[in-house]
Amino acid sequence: MTDQTNKIYLSDVTLRDGMHAIRHQYSLDSAVAIARALDDAGVDSIEVAHGDGLSGSSFNYGFGAHTDLQWIEAVAGTVKRAQVATLLLPGIGTVHDLRAAYDAGARIVRIATHCTEADISKQHIAYARELGMDTVGFLMMSHMTSPDALAQQAKLMESYGAQCVYVVDSGGALGMRDVAARFDALKAVLDPATQTGMHAHHNLSLGVANSIVALEHGCDRIDASLTGMGAGAGNAPLEVFVAAVDRLGLHHGCDVKQLIDAAEDIVRPLQERPVRVDRETLALGYAGVYSSFLRHTEAAAAKYGLSAFDIMVELGRRRMVGGQEDMIVDVALDMLKAREAA
């Protein structure tokens, strides 16, 4: 486990992954209120962007209530201690977007790719380092490749300049042994100076447990969000994770009661669809489907009179990955044709 004398680095993602839960509709006032509460409670960083990262606001992913820069500027002007982070997916966001985010106040960037496509992150990681940003590699859908193969992708990101590399369980499909194996593999090949992080989703109710297992296997940074606000069944709930590690005697530097109050009083009332494990979100973890497919799949199921659970299982069977949201409708239409032909 991470040395108990070392503080766990807590990266909050309520204002980025949490965007998925409300279709990217945070008001600036809500963003400021959440950021202020997180800053007061003691988190290390607050990630801010459209749910699909810089420039994610689009027909394919959903249009945001505000621009990334408006959200980032609002949060950067609010926090006194926490650093502002953002997310960039090569192919959606560009280095020009990254520069604009930096100018707006972001000082940390997570460059996110599918777990087997680290090679497309080279330009963005290098540019982030030129800007002097804390530069993080973010390997999404980490359940879809082996621990050793994932470690080699992490090594690529490190070679480009990433100072930290994340195991990202985008589908909430990893078990505790899976997490342990991946961190052991990363630690075996990465330079000791390169940190590692865990981004969990709660689709199998393992978000907190997997994050603790990651710590036991050398993880340095943990992503979490208030009430678990995030795609699918959400992320590891920040207030729950901090309470759990507090009972384990680990140093986290946060005020547990303030986090609980922020979760219940500020964030939970914003949920238009409860962020929880239910039939549809469990299907994501069971089938290993990208968590942000949830709302898109539910919309397709309602439109075509199909089961969202069945669509998700088929998406998992076809091994769809982030960025293939347009295929959800294709899968639904294929299922509709098959039903009509039966």
Curated annotation (Swiss-Prot):
It catalyses: (S)-4-hydroxy-2-oxopentanoate = acetaldehyde + pyruvate. Mn(2+) binds at D17, H199, H201. Pfam families: DmpG_comm (PF07836), HMGL-like (PF00682). One of its GO terms (molecular function) is manganese ion binding. The record marks R16 as: Transition state stabilizer. It is an enzyme of class 4 (lyase). Signal peptide: none annotated. Gene3D superfamilies: 1.10.8.60, Aldolase class I. It comes from the Bacteria. InterPro entries: 2-IPM_HCS-like, 4OH_2_O-val_aldolase, Aldolase_TIM, DmpG_comm, DRE_TIM_HOA, PYR_CT. Keywords: Aromatic hydrocarbons catabolism, Lyase, Manganese, Metal-binding. The keyword Metal-binding applies. Residues 8-260 form the Pyruvate carboxyltransferase domain. Its EC number is 4.1.3.39. Substrate binds at R16, D17, S170, H199, Y290. One of its GO terms (biological process) is catabolic process. The active site is at H20. Belongs to the 4-hydroxy-2-oxovalerate aldolase family. This is 4-hydroxy-2-oxovalerate aldolase 4.
